[in-house]
C-alpha cells in the first residue's frame, strides 16, 4: 500500500539510529545510489569544532562561533567529511576536537546555527541525512524516515572490527559497556532524545549485510512512488 505522504520537490530520507548501527554507511550508499546529497549530522558538530580550533576561536566566544558556522564550506562525499574542500575525516576524530565539540554544543545560539546549517543541506535532487534526530527534529517532513536498530552485541562487534581494521587496539567488552551507557544517555536526555519518529520505518540490522539494509531502504522509497 502506498503512503499518502505528499511528494516534496526536494525529498529527504532520514536515517537515524544509535552508535554503530550502520546508519552512516547505509546513508552514504543510499545517497550514492539515488544521486542525492549526503548529510552526516554528527560530523557537522566536529567540523565546526575543528574549524574553531584552527581559527583560534575560543569555545566561549558565541558570536564568533555562530559566524564561523554560518560561513563554513562543508561537504560530505563518498564517506568523507570535507572542510574547505579538504578531507578532514581523520582530523575530526581527534580527542581535542571531540572535547571542543562538546564544549561548543552547550551554547543555544551555536546549536541553532548548526540546525540551520543541517537544514540548508536540503537541495535538489534530494538529501539523505543520518544522525539521531533527523526524522524527529531536523526534517520532520521527510518523505521517508528510517530508524536503524541492532543489538548492542552486534554493534560492539562491528565497532571492534572497524577499530581493528584501522590499526587501533580495542576490547570488545569495553566497547559493549560503552555502547550501552551511551544508549542510556542518548535515550534519556531532555533535548532531542534518541527515539524513532512516530512514522519511521524500523530496520533491525543485527543480522543484515550492508547491501541488504540499503536494498530495504530503497524498496521503501520506491513504495512511496519515488523514482529509485
Swiss-Prot record:
Residues the entry annotates as binding ATP: 17-25
Cellular component terms per the entry's GO annotation: cytosol
Coiled-coil annotated residue ranges, if any: none
SUPFAM superfamilies: P-loop containing nucleoside triphosphate hydrolases
Family listed: Belongs to the cytidylate kinase family. Type 1 subfamily.
NCBIfam families attached to this UniProt entry: cmk
The name this protein goes by in its record: Cytidylate kinase
Organism: Burkholderia lata (strain ATCC 17760 / DSM 23089 / LMG 22485 / NCIMB 9086 / R18194 / 383)
